[in-house]
């Protein structure tokens, strides 16, 4: 009897040990792909470098502005929350804008300084991601933007050009959060007042954007994806309160999840060069995320 008890205990211990070892191995670095266990380094080759299969901050593009470059320094810190089916992401975003030549040009530096996320098992498998949560500190890409005022006219319209570069400084490519590859885009933004009262303190403005967006991929044949960048919307001001709404996105040529678009809404209140900013973004097509953010901007 004692012999059978000993054999049973040893058997159960072996089963339990094997079960937890398999779970630990799967969580650490391996997932079954179509019934075949693959190391995370091999699964990185299966990543799809498009907005549909990456995190919410992997493919940034221009905010639709009113076509005028500001003449004040701006330092912004913004907390953001993004939610899609099977993915919840929170991050801290920072931005510094420096005007040049009294608003005739400008330079902006920005990026996500910290990000955390939680993906479902289904989303992890769909994206071929290694982990569902960040195993280490996750940081985003550094973005450098330059602006040039081409036309500034209260009577006709304002026209602004921008050149933008996203570096490969972000990490967690293995989790499909950032691409670890550079991208760049150029755009022209135009704006015109529909009406303007009280020296511009009450105004409604129509604005639009058109440009070119390009990013590097892991495709062995077509190493980059090119896209048409677009946007249209309205902005307004009522003394210390400003608001904006637009529909923007870009459209790539590969049709592999590269057609993201977003409805963006912004409400801001300014008091003595301090701005409180509330934003909401509703993703459509290949942008699967809805986003909400609260930001503070200090002007100098």
Placement of each model-derived feature along the sequence:
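Bacterial N-terminal signal peptides that target proteins for export
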Residues: 1-9
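C-terminal segment of classical bacterial N-terminal signal peptides
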Residues: 14-22
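Transmembrane beta-barrel domains of Gram-negative outer membranes and organellar outer membranes
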Residues: 24-167, 182-189, 195, 241-246, ...
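Outer-membrane beta-barrel domain signature
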Residues: 50, 64, 81-87, 131-135, ...
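Transmembrane beta-strands of outer-membrane beta-barrel pores
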Residues: 79-83, 111-117, 150, 163-171, ...
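Outer membrane beta-barrel transmembrane domains
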Residues: 120-122, 127-132, 221-224, 228-300
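Residue-level detection of beta-strand scaffold positions
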Residues: 147, 155-157, 202-209, 229, ...
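Detector for outer-membrane/organellar transmembrane beta-barrel domains
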Residues: 179-252
């Amino acid at each position: 009897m004692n012999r059978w008890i000993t054999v049973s205990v040893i058997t159960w211990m072996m089963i339990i040990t094997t079960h937890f070892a398999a779970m630990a191995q799967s969580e650490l670095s391996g997932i079954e792909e179509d019934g075949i266990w693959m190391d995370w380094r091999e699964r990185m080759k299966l990543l799809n470098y498009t907005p549909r299969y990456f995190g919410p901050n992997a493919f940034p593009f221009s905010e639709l502005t009113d076509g005028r470059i500001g003449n004040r320094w701006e330092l912004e810190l913004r907390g953001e929350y993004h939610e899609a089916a099977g993915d919840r992401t929170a991050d801290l975003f920072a931005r510094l804008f420096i005007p040049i030549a009294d608003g005739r040009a400008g330079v902006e530096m920005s990026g996500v300084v910290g990000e955390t996320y939680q993906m479902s098992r289904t989303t992890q498998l769909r994206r071929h991601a290694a982990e569902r949560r960040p195993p280490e500190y996750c940081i985003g890409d550094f973005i450098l933007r330059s602006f040039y005022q081409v036309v500034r006219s209260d009577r006709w319209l304002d026209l602004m050009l921008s050149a933008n570069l996203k570096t490969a400084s972000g990490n967690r490519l293995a989790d499909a959060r950032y691409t670890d590859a550079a991208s760049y885009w150029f755009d022209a933004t135009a704006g015109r007042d529909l009406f303007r009262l009280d020296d511009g303190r009450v105004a409604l403005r129509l604005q639009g954007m058109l440009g070119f967006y390009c990013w590097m991929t892991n495709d062995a044949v077509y190493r980059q994806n090119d896209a048409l960048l677009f946007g249209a919307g309205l902005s307004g001001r009522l003394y210390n309160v400003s608001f904006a709404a637009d529909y923007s996105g870009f459209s790539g040529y590969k049709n592999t999840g590269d057609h993201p678009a977003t409805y963006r809404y912004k409400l801001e209140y300014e008091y003595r060069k301090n701005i409180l900013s509330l934003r909401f973004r509703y993703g459509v097509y290949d942008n699967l995320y809805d986003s909400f953010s609260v930001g503070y901007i200090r002007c100098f």
